[in-house]
C-alpha cells in the first residue's frame, strides 16, 4: 500500500484548471476491500446490472461512429477470451470480474463533488491517467472501471461517503497476468488523420 500512496502523491501534480483538484480518492485493500466485493457478489444474482449509475456512462441513443466503435470493442474483447455472443451467462460472469477488481489487491474508488462541471470531470480523467502511467513506471498494472458506478449505493455505505460526492469509477492496481489472452488484446484506434493540422510543415519539426 505504501507504493500506491507514493503513486497517488506524484499523481496529484496532474493538470487541474484553477488548481481545484476535484478528485476524491478512497484507496482500500485487504478485509475492507473483500467486504465490498463479497457484498456485491451476494447481490449480483438478483441485480446483474447493479443499482444503475448516477450519470450516463455513454450518451443515450449513441450514434455512429461511436456506437460502432463501442460494439466492436465489446465483441473483440469477448472474442479474445473465446466467449461467443450467444453465451450471455459467460458474458455476465466476465462483467462480474470487474467487481472483484479482476483480482487486484488494491482498489481505488474515485469520487467527484456533484456540483462540479465538465472541466472538473476532465481534471479527474487527467488525474486517473497520471495514476495509471506512474503505476506502470513503478512496475504495477491498473484498470480503470466505470462498472463500479453501477454499485454506488453499496460502495458508499461501506466507505461512509457524504452524499455530496458521486462515485465516478473504480480502479484496480496490482500485477497483471501477462499470459492471460485478455491482457494481450488491444482496442483498435483511428489513424492520426483524425487530427486537423493547419500548421506549416516547418512548425512540426
Where are these regions (language model features)?
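Small-aliphatic-rich amphipathic alpha-helix that forms the alpha element of a beta-alpha
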Residues: 6-12, 106-158
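N-terminal amphipathic, basic helical "cap/leader" segment at the start of enzyme domains
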Residues: 1-98
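Conserved small/polar residues in nucleotide/adenosyl-binding loops
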Residues: 195-201
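Conserved hydrophobic/aromatic beta-strand scaffold that supports enzyme active sites
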Residues: 27, 107-109, 170-172
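A glycine-rich helix N-cap at a beta->alpha junction
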Residues: 161-182
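Short, charged/polar surface micro-motifs in flexible loops or helix N-caps
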Residues: 31-34, 114-115, 177
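A structural motif
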Residues: 97-106
Amino acid at each position: 500500500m505504501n507504493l500506491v500512496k507514493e503513486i497517488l502523491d506524484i499523481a496529484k501534480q496532474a493538470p487541474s484548471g484553477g488548481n481545484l483538484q476535484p478528485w476524491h480518492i478512497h484507496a482500500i485493500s485487504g478485509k475492507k476491500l473483500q467486504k465490498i466485493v463479497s457484498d456485491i457478489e451476494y447481490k449480483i444474482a438478483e441485480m446483474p446490472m447493479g443499482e444503475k449509475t448516477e450519470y450516463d456512462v455513454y450518451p443515450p441513443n449513441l450514434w455512429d461512429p461511436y456506437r460502432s466503435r463501442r460494439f466492436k470493442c465489446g465483441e473483440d474483447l469477448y472474442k479474445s477470451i473465446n466467449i461467443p455472443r450467444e453465451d450471455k451467462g459467460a458474458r455476465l460472469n466476465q462483467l462480474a470480474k470487474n467487481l472483484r477488481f479482476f483480482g487486484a489487491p488494491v482498489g481505488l474508488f474515485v469520487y467527484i463533488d456533484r456540483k462540479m462541471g465538465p472541466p472538473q470531470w476532465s481534471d479527474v480523467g487527467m488525474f486517473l491517467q497520471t495514476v495509471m502511467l506512474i503505476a506502470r513506471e513503478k512496475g504495477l498494472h491498473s484498470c480503470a472501471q466505470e462498472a463500479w458506478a453501477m454499485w454506488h449505493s453499496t460502495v458508499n455505505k461501506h466507505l461512509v461517503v457524504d452524499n455530496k460526492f458521486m462515485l465516478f469509477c473504480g480502479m484496480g492496481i496490482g500485477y497483471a497476468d501477462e499470459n492471460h489472452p485478455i491482457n494481450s488484446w488491444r482496442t483498435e484506434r483511428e489513424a492520426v488523420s483524425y487530427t486537423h493540422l493547419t500548421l506549416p510543415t516547418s512548425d512540426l519539426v
